[in-house]
Curated annotation (Swiss-Prot):
Post-translational events: Contains one covalently linked 15,16-dihydrobiliverdin chromophore.
Protein name as catalogued: Phycoerythrin alpha-3 chain, chloroplastic
Location in or out of the cell: Plastid, Chloroplast thylakoid membrane
Organism: Rhodomonas sp. (strain CS 24) (Chroomonas sp. (strain CS24))
Keywords of this entry: Bile pigment, Chloroplast, Chromophore, Electron transport, Hydroxylation, Membrane, Photosynthesis, Plastid, Thylakoid, Transit peptide, Transport
GO cellular component terms given for this protein: chloroplast thylakoid membrane; phycobilisome
Function: Light-harvesting photosynthetic tetrapyrrole chromophore-protein from the phycobiliprotein complex.
Miscellaneous section: The light-harvesting system in Cryptophytes contains phycobiliprotein complexes. Unusually they are composed of either phycoerythrin (CPE) or phycocyanin (CPC) but never allophycocyanin (APC), with only one type of biliprotein being present in any one species. Unlike cyanobacteria or red algae these proteins are not arranged into higher-order phycobilisome complexes, and they are found in the thylakoid lumen.
């Protein structure tokens, strides 16, 4: 705790050294108040435990860009109001979709990635 207080006072002191107007205008009372404020805040600066959790929903953003400029087909993807310009023929759709991959596809990709790796001591195998 003493180290944190000392570090916060050092930061305040270095800020006062680089700002001449601040160091000229600060009296002893302001320095003591700043030090007291830093000492009061220091216990609250301790790190909080991380609240991150793995999202197991297997959802990923799916971005689809529609560009119907110059196309004779009537666009049916958008149901909103028209702007009256070429922007009526363009749209970006963003959806959160569930990603599904079969175990066999995953095994094939893993094998493909492993074959690309070669270490200093030879090809990568699961026994290395």
């Amino acid at each position: 705790m003493f180290a944190k207080t000392l570090a916060s006072l050092a930061v305040i002191g270095s800020a006062a050294a680089y700002v001449p107007m601040m160091s000229m205008d600060m009296g002893r009372r302001e320095v003591v108040q700043a030090g007291a404020a830093a000492a009061a805040v220091t216990p609250f600066l301790s790190g909080a435990p991380a609240g991150a959790a793995m999202d197991k929903s297997a959802k990923a953003p799916q971005i689809t860009i529609f560009d119907h400029r110059g196309c004779s087909r009537a666009p049916k993807e958008s149901t909103g109001g028209k702007a009256g310009g070429q922007d009526d023929e363009m749209m970006v759709k963003v959806a959160s979709t569930k990603v599904t991959v079969s175990e066999s596809d995953a095994a094939k990709k893993l094998q493909e990635f492993i074959t690309f790796e070669k270490g200093i001591d030879g090809p990568f195998t699961s026994k290395n």
